[in-house]
Design a protein with these regions (language model features):
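Short amphipathic helical patch at the helix-1/turn junction of helix-turn-helix
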Residues: 97, 111, 177-179, 305-306
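N-terminal core-binding DNA-recognition domain of tyrosine site-specific recombinases/integrases
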Residues: 8-11, 47-125, 266-268, 286-292
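A short, basic/aromatic helix-end/turn motif that makes direct DNA contacts
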Residues: 189-195, 315-321, 329-332
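Basic, Lys/Arg- and aromatic-enriched nucleic-acid-binding interface segment
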Residues: 107, 122, 126, 132-184, ...
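DNA/chromatin major-groove-contacting recognition/catalytic segments
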Residues: 216-218, 307, 328-348
Length: 348
């Protein structure tokens, strides 16, 4: 309330203005009032909501980010006390200290933190996101050679020949990845009914992916979700791919999946990647080269680039909208082809 000495039209008007001003300040103060919460509780709240919005495999991956975030930031600090400079000091520690995380990984952590603090702003724990004005510190890193991402022709032959004689199921699976440029989860989750063989056209339909992250063998199954919208696609099969499909089906008679273990469960990524890693040197592959199931997808891209298939066609085939690795491999291969052409011209 407002009390003035006189009761006139002018003083009543003044009183009304003063009262409205007080109400406005009171409301502003109320809107600026934030609820106290410690950082670990905020992260827990955010992650609980996040897991309901994404695929379980994505949530499983992000769980690793969350673990590092809780090591970086004091879990008991009040969120309202966190500043941009505080965040910067924490990133400097994990990027340049014993942790020595890469810029790429730091970027994903920054993205996750920004989402967490945005949640805090929207739920009354913060008035401003401390990540908004934060830029990652620059870090000098060794540039990876593009050739590390795919197998050369001789390397591919060494791997496939070894797999064919040492593990038939893995050989068929890796051939399928290479011939069709599929992701592990797309190929491992592909059902026999997803492949269409006809006189007019042979193709496989990518309609989902294997949901495997953090699950036991009997819990793993295909879900009708893919990494991106572009991942939903039909992939044409050549004659060799059809042959691989037929052989794989003969080995998985007791399963609806094209590729399975002897017990009928889908092939697990950790099993096949461990096999590739442990047998790499016996295959004749350089011990420093990273060999995993994903390299066959990149090798498929490199082969299409060698065949001068346009980049946008390659991206559509492998289910990429705008993937830097695909583009880098393409440019590397086409540049190498141009250099080879120049040398051949000198022989004319």
């Amino acid at each position: 309330s407002v009390t003035l000495d006189k009761d006139t039209r002018i003083t009543r008007s003044q009183a009304q203005k003063i009262l409205l001003s007080k109400i406005s300040k009171s409301q502003q103060h109320a809107s600026n009032t934030i609820s106290p919460i410690v950082f670990s509780d905020l992260v827990s709240e955010w992650f609980q909501l996040y897991t309901k919005q994404v695929r379980s495999s994505t949530a499983y991956t992000v769980k690793g980010n969350v673990k590092l975030i809780l090591e970086m930031v004091d879990p008991d600090i009040l969120v309202s006390k966190i500043t941009t400079s505080y965040i910067r000091s924490k990133f400097e520690t994990v990027m340049f200290g014993d942790r020595n995380i890469s810029t790429t990984y730091a970027r994903s952590i920054r993205t996750r933190l920004k989402s967490i603090f945005q949640y805090a702003c929207e739920h009354g724990y913060l008035t401003e996101n401390p990540i908004n004005n934060f830029r990652l510190p620059k870090k000098k890193e060794n540039v990876k050679q593009i050739s590390e991402f795919f197998l050369e022709e001789d390397e591919l032959n060494k791997v496939m020949n070894y797999l064919e004689t040492h593990n038939t199921r893995y050989w068929l699976f890796c051939e399928w990845l290479y011939l069709n440029g599929l992701r592990y989860s797309e190929a491992a989750g592909m059902l026999k009914k997803d492949v269409i063989i006809s006189e007019d056209r042979n193709f496989c339909k990518v309609t989902g992916a294997l949901d495997y992250a953090g699950k036991k063998a009997d819990e793993i199954k295909k879900i009708n979700q893919t990494k991106t919208i572009a991942s939903l696609r039909e992939v044409d099969l050549n004659s060799k791919a059809v042959e691989i499909y037929t052989k794989a089906c003969d080995l998985s008679l007791n399963s609806e999946y094209i590729f399975s273990t002897s017990t009928g469960t889908p092939i697990h990524i950790s099993a096949i990647d461990t096999f590739l890693r442990e047998h790499k040197e016996r295959m004749g592959i350089d011990k420093n080269k990273k060999l995993s199931s994903h390299i066959f997808r990149h090798t498929h891209i490199s082969k299409l680039a060698e065949l001068e298939v346009p980049l946008h066609i390659i991206q559509r085939r492998v289910g990429h909208q705008n993937e830097s690795v695909t583009r880098d491999i393409y440019l590397h291969i086409t540049s190498r082809a141009k250099d080879k052409t120049k040398k051949l011209l000198e022989m004319i």
